[in-house]
Amino acid sequence: MLNFLQSVQFAKEIEKKIIEYEQDIDISEATMLYEIAKHDFDLVKNLADTIKRYYFKNNIELCSIYPAKVGMCTEDCKFCSQSIYHSCKIEIKDVASVDEVIEYLENIIAFPVKRFSLVTSGGELNDSEFERIIDIISYISKNYDIHLCASLGFLTKERAKKLMLAGVTRYHNNLETSSTYFKNICSTHTQAQKIETLKIAKETGLEICSGGIISMGEDMIERIKLAFELRELKVDSVPINILNPIKGTPFEDMKIMDQNEIFITLALFRIVLPRKTILLAGGKENALKDMEKIAYKCGINGCMVGNYLTTQGMGIKEKVEMLESLGLEV
């Protein structure tokens, strides 16, 4: 274990490696930073914040999602309220109409939200559902000045091309957790299927967005491994969700990890992925409460605003005001 002066020197060397030499750290260095953070959290937090400010200044990117299809999912992800295998009380919704989506979109464009995504439940949409989503995306693309994303499950090359032509610039599919821990959260599909979808999207010319959910019983080594696996995929954006244990799911009694562990995780993701957009996404209000402000000093340069898929978030106006109070430029 390094003493304090050695820890300071190690952090300086990592900063120089990333900023001056533009080199990435390896997994042993990330693990060492975790060991340092257990005793000197501010040292690692400040390193992450310095790296974030070097590449992104005080800017923070806002995105918002719309649940364009809800429930009746035939996958068995243990964290999700939309699975048919679980007993959650949610409102089932077929694919939304253009009018329903536009009504929500009109509420968010008054704020500096850069990206807007349609998200659908299930492993993949049938052809009719997919074409309805294409119609919505095409309408928004032609009539609104906002970057469009989509999260529609598994993807084919043909569908990826259609999405890009309709106006989508970024495709989302979370790895959820590390490759070695994935078996603990889902059995109806593999992480390899998710990776194949991300590769198809990237090869088509779409940017890719992929992250995960922390606090599902994994340890920090698994989280660090996820960060490196995302780096290997050359993702453009990394949403980090914090489990919100929902009644009726297998994870309803899962204990939320310590807030300090959450902050360390965020900082390590920034240091491992220094030049990527890292968003604080679902579950942040429930897990962090009044301590959420600290997260934006841990290397975060993105924030999902508004509601989530089946749970409520903070009002966009309140969230923007909070971010601006921290000196962040939205």
From Swiss-Prot:
Enumerate the cofactors the protein uses: [4Fe-4S] cluster; [2Fe-2S] cluster
Highest taxon above the source species: Bacteria
Pathway-wise, it operates in: Cofactor biosynthesis; biotin biosynthesis; biotin from 7,8-diaminononanoate: step 2/2
**Which of this chain's residues are annotated to bind [2Fe-2S] cluster?**
S117, C149, C209
Q: How does it assemble?
A: Homodimer.
What task does this protein carry out? Catalyzes the conversion of dethiobiotin (DTB) to biotin by the insertion of a sulfur atom into dethiobiotin via a radical-based mechanism.
- Tell me what this protein is called: Biotin synthase
Gene assigned in the entry: bioB
